Design a protein with these regions (language model features):
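Active-site-proximal alpha/beta segments of enzymes that process anionic O-linked groups
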Residues: 1-178
């Protein structure tokens, strides 16, 4: 038995849309009854003046390039923010690293979360507190299925950004965000 999917081909041919892919229910996979996430409930205080939350994920970027000389705008932005520098990546690859960033777990649990529909606690809590969540991807978030695993409950989810080149997409993302 060798599992095979044609998701990208079907999207390219217009047979299914990215929204259809996000809503797919993979009934052929065994449901995980052992998934217990989160183990403890989140404890926090709701403030009358909630803070803005900006999470920037740059794929295949060496942290040593994060400095005033190489990335002055990002560096300047970070200087005026709270920075969390103790995060340890759960993988060297995009899929595992992003999964670990949002779930704080090893990507060995990827399939369990894909099947269960359980969303990251961060996203659940931001939605519960009525934060406006904007996802601005340069690459598609349909494959790997970040849209389904991380953001399926985010309203009006943007799964891709139009543009012929990475530069075009990055310019569009910057303009849309600002």
């Amino acid at each position: 038995y060798f599992p095979l999917t044609a998701t990208r081909l079907m999207m390219k041919l217009g047979v299914v849309s990215s929204k259809d892919v996000i809503k797919m229910n993979f009934n052929n996979k065994k449901q995980s009854a052992d998934l217990n996430y989160p183990i403890d409930s989140l404890k926090y205080e709701v403030h009358s003046n909630p803070k803005n939350v900006v999470l920037i994920a740059i794929d295949s970027w060496n942290y040593r390039a994060f400095n005033q000389d190489i990335t002055p705008h990002i560096s300047h932005f970070a200087d005026s923010c709270s920075r969390f520098t103790s995060h340890l990546s759960s993988s060297n690859g995009t899929r595992g690293s992003i999964f670990g960033l949002f779930f704080s777990l090893s990507s060995i649990y990827w399939t369990d979360f894909e099947v269960s529909g359980i969303q990251p606690l961060l996203i659940e809590e931001l939605l519960k507190q009525n934060y406006q969540i904007g996802i601005y991807p340069s690459a598609t978030i349909v494959n790997p299925p970040f849209a389904k695993i991380l953001f399926s409950k985010v309203p009006d989810l943007r799964t891709h950004t139009e543009g012929k080149t990475v530069y075009d997409r990055d310019c569009r993302i910057t303009a849309d965000y600002l």
